[in-house]
């Protein structure tokens, strides 16, 4: 390092402490980066990479960003999961001896961003800290630095359960210790897409002990200690807005695993990963940012305590029944800014005058809101607003101190109102009168000299001056004007009188700016005292906002208040999928009942694709979740039990466990339900077993149904294409067949989307293929083959005389499919021994088949033909079909 210049040595010394972050090194008006940081930053930010002399034989890579535009570049790096250390000059370069002293004043990470475009106003920005203990348990602590919220929980399940809970927090960054293995870290970084950071210290930092007063378990305190130490180490400033740690237990809420949340599209859609089209999108009628965040938290964790759910429902009913109260509340909430994050900015020291003006305007709405709620005859409302302080003293303080239209910067003056501070008023009087005197002097000088173009101006370098054009210089009295500056076409002068006033005016203006900044800083400290009250008030306002949102959407969409029962029965009359109905936008939506009395546990659902089976299943789950977060539900009547968990297997494979086949994912999710579901759970399985061969899939599907029916007793909707399973209704007393109805008109199928009792009699697979616009010739041939199969006729083909040349890619051997290819080859070899006319084919002409005589079949052949009739060819791959053909041929040959 000795060969480098002192400044580069300083850079390297600081960088050594922040190896995993980009070091923004302040040099004048730029943040500079050097060495590997420069190369990588230039690529990520798409800025110019240059170099400089650093004292060594080779030039040092360098890039930089302007100080005033740094925030944009920092956000770009944070969005990509990087960290940025801000290294500032901490002494005046004018007074520095040698290299200016520099220190890192903040480490910005994905989990500690306070503001910017990466922060969604209606989402929390959680930082998580995970601690593992010798007994295999974990403690998970989370902090949202923007709001000060802190939570902690103990996790005793599997590693997968822990990862899913971490994922559920939505954290962008997780703090661990050095005992975590590389495999575990990979799951966090690659699977959960989180930035991993390290913190070994777990002792609660000095001054933050009051925040863990209610946390008595050592494990939980350890996790919180790790979290707090990391936050303090990265932020290096006051964190007075941190709230007391809240303990939560996962068994206090309905469990919905990540796969189910995705399949049900609770907060984002499966396809676009956006809010629009999700249940959250439909329910979000909140008027405040903090209300939007609370709504999402409620949706992530539905309640399972019947009394608490009913409290929310009663409050929603109050708002539904009182239109004028609800509309008045909404109008007031529109004027309420984000109290939580404003309080955070106050504590953080980043609040400006406009923020405080927003705070004042928000607080001005609070007394009327609290008064209106206090008049309600509702115990939940009374409990909700109990202890809420409208902070009227703070409102008055801000009203008499902050100008109505202050500048964005707190260092430009014009922030504090007249009358707030006597000294400031005095300086302002001098400044204002001084400027009036300047205007009068200009008028007087014009009269004395007779120069109409004479003017008095000001600039930062020369101060005040009298400017006269060169053509008029001869008109100036001698000895009165002192030359100050010469221009191309004019001369600038100063007089003793102007010099005296200039001193007074400039001193006053400098003192005004400095005094206003000092007064604002002091005001900010006064506001800090109110932070706990503001945070409590924010929770009250947020909850009221969510409840009015439920009431608003319930009235708009014709939802009804659900009745919760302790019995294990479901009674939903005219239930609807709320999002699908909304997207249809006025088009006819077909509602469906779901009646499952206490003695009915399983609905076995059959019916064609596109008929609405999956929608019906999702509909029940969404109705259940909506009820348990305290919202009305889309139905004309609803009686529901309180479910402890929801398990779903709907749609294609889309999970956190990368690299697994569709069938493996099905089995893992089935295992999750079988291992963890109780009789108070809801299970939704769509087409379980489709990812393997027909008989394997059918056998597994039947075994799973029987296990759920006999061993678990959970309310279950199980859809299937295996129509053979419908006979289970005869042996399983708590299972009932239902189907999605359809009718045929003029050879075309019409899906009625109506759930009816009994099993489906047809699959309508060919009709679905028609809707998918498969070629007409293919559809016609499929109908032909289907008719022959249903009539138990043989299907034969002529010997092929001409084969089209296959594309080159089809001729290449596929290593993975060699076993299957071998089976196909065996089929072909054995088929040569059979009479040519009896070979099976999908290409025999109708004329030739008519000429053939129907053979007399023995019992074995009749049984095989019956099996062929049941095969759903459209639900098999070509290779699966060939394997099935091979099996049937072997069976016939054994005869």
Curated annotation (Swiss-Prot):
Keyword tags: ATP-binding, DNA damage, DNA repair, DNA-binding, Nucleotide-binding
Binding positions (ATP): 607-614
SMART domains: MUTSac, MUTSd
Entries under Gene3D superfamilies matching the protein: 1.10.1420.10, DNA repair protein MutS, domain I, MutS, connector domain, P-loop containing nucleotide triphosphate hydrolases
The UniProt record lists the keyword Heme: no
SUPFAM superfamilies linked: DNA repair protein MutS, domain I (SSF55271), DNA repair protein MutS, domain II (SSF53150), DNA repair protein MutS, domain III (SSF48334), P-loop containing nucleoside triphosphate hydrolases (SSF52540)
Entry-linked CDD domains: ABC_MutS1 (cd03284)
GO cellular-component term (any): cytosol
Alphabetical GO biological process terms: mismatch repair
Gene Ontology MF terms: ATP binding; ATP-dependent DNA damage sensor activity; damaged DNA binding; mismatched DNA binding
Pfam families: MutS_I, MutS_II, MutS_III, MutS_IV, MutS_V
Superkingdom: Bacteria
UniProt family annotation: Belongs to the DNA mismatch repair MutS family.
NCBIfam families xref list: mutS1 (TIGR01070), PRK05399.1 (NF003810)
Protein role: This protein is involved in the repair of mismatches in DNA. It is possible that it carries out the mismatch recognition step. This protein has a weak ATPase activity.
Protein name listed in UniProt: DNA mismatch repair protein MutS
């Amino acid at each position: 390092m000795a060969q480098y210049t002192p400044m580069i040595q300083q850079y390297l010394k600081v960088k050594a402490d922040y190896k995993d972050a980009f070091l923004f090194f302040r040099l004048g008006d730029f943040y500079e980066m050097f060495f590997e940081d420069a190369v990588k930053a230039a690529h990520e930010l798409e800025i110019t990479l240059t170099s400089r002399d650093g004292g060594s034989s080779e030039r040092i890579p360098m890039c930089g960003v302007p100080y005033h535009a740094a925030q944009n570049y920092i956000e770009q790096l944070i969005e990509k999961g990087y960290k940025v250390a801000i290294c500032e000059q901490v002494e005046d370069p004018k007074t520095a001896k040698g290299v200016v002293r520099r220190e890192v004043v903040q480490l910005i990470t994905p989990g500690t961003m306070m503001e910017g475009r990466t922060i969604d106003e209606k989402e929390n920005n959680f930082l998580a800290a995970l601690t593992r203990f010798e007994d295999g348990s974990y403690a998970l602590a989370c902090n949202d630095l923007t709001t000060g919220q802190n939570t902690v929980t103990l996790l005793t399940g599997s590693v997968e359960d822990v990862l899913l809970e971490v994922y559920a927090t939505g954290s962008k960054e997780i703090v661990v210790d050095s005992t975590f293995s590389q495999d575990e870290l990979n799951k966090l970084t690659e699977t959960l897409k989180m930035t991993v950071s390290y913190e070994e210290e777990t002792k609660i930092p000095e001054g933050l002990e009051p925040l863990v007063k209610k946390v008595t378990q050592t494990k939980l305190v350890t996790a919180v200690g790790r979290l707090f130490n990391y936050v303090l180490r990265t932020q290096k400033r006051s964190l007075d807005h941190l709230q007391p740690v809240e303990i939560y237990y996962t068994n206090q809420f309905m469990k919905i695993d990540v796969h189910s949340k995705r399949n049900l599209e609770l907060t984002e859609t499966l396809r676009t990963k956006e809010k629009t089209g999700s249940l959250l999108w439909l329910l979000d009628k909140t008027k405040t940012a903090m209300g939007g965040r609370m709504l999402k938290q409620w949706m992530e964790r539905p309640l399972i305590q019947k009394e608490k759910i009913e409290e929310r429902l009663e409050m929603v009913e109050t708002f539904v029944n009182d239109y004028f109260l609800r509309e008045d509340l909404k109008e007031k909430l529109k004027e309420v800014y984000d109290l939580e994050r404003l309080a955070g900015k106050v504590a953080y020291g980043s609040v400006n005058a406009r923020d405080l003006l927003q705070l004042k305007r928000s607080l001005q709405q609070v007394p009327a809101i609290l008064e209106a709620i206090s008049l309600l005859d509702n115990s939940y409302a009374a409990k909700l607003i109990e202890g809420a302080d409208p902070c009227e003293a703070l409102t008055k303080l801000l009203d008499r101190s902050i100008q109505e239209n202050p500048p964005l910067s707190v260092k430009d003056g014009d922030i504090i109102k007249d009358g707030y501070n006597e000294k400031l008023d005095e300086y302002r009087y001098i400044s204002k009168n001084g400027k009036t005197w300047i205007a009068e002097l200009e008028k007087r000088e014009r009269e004395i000299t007779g120069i109409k173009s004479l003017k008095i101006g000001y600039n930062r370098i020369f101060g005040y001056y009298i400017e006269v054009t060169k053509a008029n210089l001869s008109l100036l009295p001698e000895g009165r004007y002192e030359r100050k500056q010469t221009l191309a076409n004019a001369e600038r002068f100063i007089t003793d009188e102007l010099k005296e006033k200039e001193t007074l005016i400039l001193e006053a203006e400098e003192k005004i700016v400095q005094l206003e900044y000092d007064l604002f800083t002091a005001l900010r400290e006064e506001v800090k005292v109110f932070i706990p009250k503001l945070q409590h008030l924010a929770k009250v306002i947020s909850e009221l906002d969510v409840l009015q949102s439920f009431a608003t959407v319930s009235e708009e969409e014709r939802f009804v208040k659900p009745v919760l029962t302790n019995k294990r029965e479901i009674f939903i009359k005219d239930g609807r999928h709320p999002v699908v109905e909304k997207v249809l936008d006025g088009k006819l939506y077909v509602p469906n009942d779901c009646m499952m009395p206490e003695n009915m546990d399983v609905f076995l659902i059959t019916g064609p694709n596109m008929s609405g089976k999956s929608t019906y299943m999702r509909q029940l789950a969404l109705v259940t979740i909506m009820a348990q977060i305290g919202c009305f539900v889309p139905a004309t009547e609803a009686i529901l039990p309180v479910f402890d968990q929801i398990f779903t297997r709907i749609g294609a494979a889309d999970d956190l466990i990368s690299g697994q086949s569709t069938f493996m994912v099905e089995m893992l999710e089935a295992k999750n339900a079988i291992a963890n579901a109780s009789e108070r759970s809801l299970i939704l399985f769509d087409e379980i077993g489709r990812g393997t061969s027909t008989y394997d899939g059918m056998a597994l599907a039947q075994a799973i149904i029987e296990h759920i029916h006999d061993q678990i007793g959970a309310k279950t909707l199980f859809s299937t294409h295996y129509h053979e399973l419908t006979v289970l209704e005869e042996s399983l007393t708590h299972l009932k067949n239902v189907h999605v109805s359809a009718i045929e008109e003029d050879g075309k199928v019409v899906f009625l989307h109506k759930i009816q009792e009994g099993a489906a009699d047809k699959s309508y697979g060919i009709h679905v293929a028609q809707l998918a616009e498969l070629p007409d010739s293919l559809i016609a041939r499929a109908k032909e083959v289907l008719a022959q199969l249903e009539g138990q006729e043989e299907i034969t083909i002529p010997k092929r005389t001409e084969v089209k040349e296959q594309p080159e890619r089809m001729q290449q051997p596929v290593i993975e499919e060699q076993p299957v290819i071998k089976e196909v080859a065996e089929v072909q070899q054995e088929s040569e021994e059979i009479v040519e006319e009896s070979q099976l084919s999908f290409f025999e002409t109708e004329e030739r088949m008519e000429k053939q005589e129907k053979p007399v079949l023995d019992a074995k052949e009749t049984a095989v033909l019956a099996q062929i009739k049941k095969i759903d060819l459209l639900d098999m791959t070509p290779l699966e079909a060939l394997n099935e053909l091979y099996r049937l041929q072997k069976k016939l040959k054994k005869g």
